Structure formats: structure tokens, C-alpha cells
Amino acid sequence: MTASPSKLAQLRELSVVVADTGDYDAIKRLQPVDCTTNPTLVKKALDLPVYADLLERELAWGRAHGGDDRTTTVDEVADRLTIGVGVKLSALVPGRVSTEVDADLAHDTQATIAKARKFVAMYAERGVPKDKILIKIAATWEGIEAARQLQLEGIDCNLTLIFNRAQALACAEANVFLISPFVGRILDYYVAQGQTPASIDEDPGVVFVRTVYNAFKQRGSSTVVMGASFRSTAQIEALAGCDRLTISPDLLEKLDAEHGELPRKLSPGNANNAQITPIDSDSFASGLAADPMATEKLASGIDTFAKDLHALRKTIADKLAG
């Protein structure tokens, strides 16, 4: 008797599966289409033997090129390591690697554009074309405006920390390639408020992603919806059929070990060519202001990403000094 396919195998038939990790061996084993990275994942990756040569090479570069401005040297080594990890991962996945622009720049459109262009150039110097990468940017108004310009230059962007309909619609109106609504962090907020959902269909993170997905498909938007920040396989299963789902290795392993039917929960349905309503900075700001959850989670998400980047830089500074 033939064993039934795992839920992960079934999910691959419904959604593009993305690995939320820089763990080389995990990606090799789980074979996602894409992968996403951030400073914390890069920092963890550098402890793995497979990245030892990269780490030593870039630290040697830092020592050789370090002048009086130590901060600039550390920042440059952090960028080189981030791109180095991405280059290695790009050889493993058939799709794309998301690489995060500094969270410190979340409210600076021009600086975000400059850093994105730098990352694309660094990848190109290492033989990775821009169609193999996504530039990950926090979905502030300034970040979305940066993505609007980058998309016009042919640089595809992943707008992250999406918690609110205004953010999502602004991204679609800007023709952003992909957005990452954060399922788990939305749930976390409401659970902390004593509002634990009675069922997975009432999970506010799941409901939000379903709402955004359906709105985009009904309006004929080409912006990809990639559910992110999952707390359980139940959340993932509830979004089966979403364009893409970025999932941590531990949850991918659980899905790979589970069997039983995995039904499609989302489908394009009768998509039409209706237009996304333009959103300006005032309506964007008012949309966020009316949503305490989104306001809190966007701010705390940027703060967490910034702290993670500073932790990566501190690790590099300590190693350069050692």
C-alpha cells in the first residue's frame, strides 16, 4: 500500500514553499523554492561550519581594509557577510533569496534605495543576478515609496512587517513584487490582550492574510502575498493555496512528518482587472493610527530588526578586535 503524501508535499502543490532560515543544511534537506534571511538568521548562520570560510575571509577583509573609522568597517563587513550568505543560499534554491535592508533606514526613502542598489551590485559582482534576489524592506510609507522606485528600476522587493490593510493596499498600488503579512505576530497581540481565538478560522492573523489575498485577487493585483511568522502548522494549513508561505525549518519538518488530507483554503477564484485604490501618505497614516495592533507591531518589528542588526555588527566588531 502506497503511503499518503506528507502535508508538506501536498502544500508544495498549492503554494510556493519558502524557508525562513539561513541554515544551509536545512535548506538543502527541505528543498524550498525560495528562502528569506535577516540579521538574526545571518548571525546564527555564521556559527555553522559551512560558513566558516566566508566568515574568515570577510573578517580578513575587514582587518586589511579597516582604517580609523571602525564603525564603517564593521558595517561593511556586515553587508559583505549578509551578501555572502545570500550568495551561498542562492546556489541551493531554484527561486529567490530575500535580503533585508537595514531596519535603521526604515523611515528614509533615499537611504533605503541606496542600500538596495548597493546590495544588488554586490550580488552582481559575485555572479548572482537581480532576478535571483528580493530586497526586503519594512512596510513604512517611506519604505513603500523606496520600493516603488526600485521596482521601476527592475529591482524586485519584499515588503515585510505587514499588519494592516492600508500597508497592503499601498504596496499593491506601488506595484511591489511581494508582501509578507505576519500571521503569528498579529495573533500574539490579541492573545496578549486576552482575546484567544476559539478556532483557527477566527485566528486574526489567518483572517488578515485571507482578506488581503482575496482583495488582491479580486482587484487583479500582481503583488504576491506571502504569509509569514507562523506559530503553528494549523496556521499554515489554514492558508494552503496562498501564493507563497515562508516557514521556519521546525514547522517544515513537522509538516513533512504529518500525513492526512491538506485541502486548499485559498484560490484566485474569479479574479478581475479592477484597480487598487491609490493611498497617499495621509490615508496611510490614518489607516495605521486607527489600528493599535498594526501601529505597535510595525514599530516593535522595526525595533527588533534594528536590534538584531546591531547584534550582528557587535559580533563582527568583537571578532575583528579579537
Curated annotation (Swiss-Prot):
Family from the record: Belongs to the transaldolase family. Type 1 subfamily.
EC number: 2.2.1.2
Active site (UniProt): 136
Transmembrane feature ranges: none
Gene name in the database record: tal
Predominant location: cytoplasm
Pfam families referenced in this protein's UniProt entry, alphabetically: TAL_FSA
UniProt-listed HAMAP family: Transaldolase_1
Signal sequence range: none
CDD domains per the UniProt record, alphabetical: Transaldolase_TalAB
Superkingdom of origin: Bacteria
Recorded catalytic activity of this chain's protein: D-sedoheptulose 7-phosphate + D-glyceraldehyde 3-phosphate = D-erythrose 4-phosphate + beta-D-fructose 6-phosphate
Name under which the protein is recorded: Transaldolase
Gene Ontology MF term list: transaldolase activity
Function text: Transaldolase is important for the balance of metabolites in the pentose-phosphate pathway.
Compartments reported by the entry: Cytoplasm
Biological process terms in GO annotation: carbohydrate metabolic process; pentose-phosphate shunt
Keyword terms: Cytoplasm, Pentose shunt, Schiff base, Transferase
GO cellular-component term (any): cytosol
Subunit structure: Homodimer.
Pathway in which the depicted protein is active: Carbohydrate degradation; pentose phosphate pathway; D-glyceraldehyde 3-phosphate and beta-D-fructose 6-phosphate from D-ribose 5-phosphate and D-xylulose 5-phosphate (non-oxidative stage): step 2/3
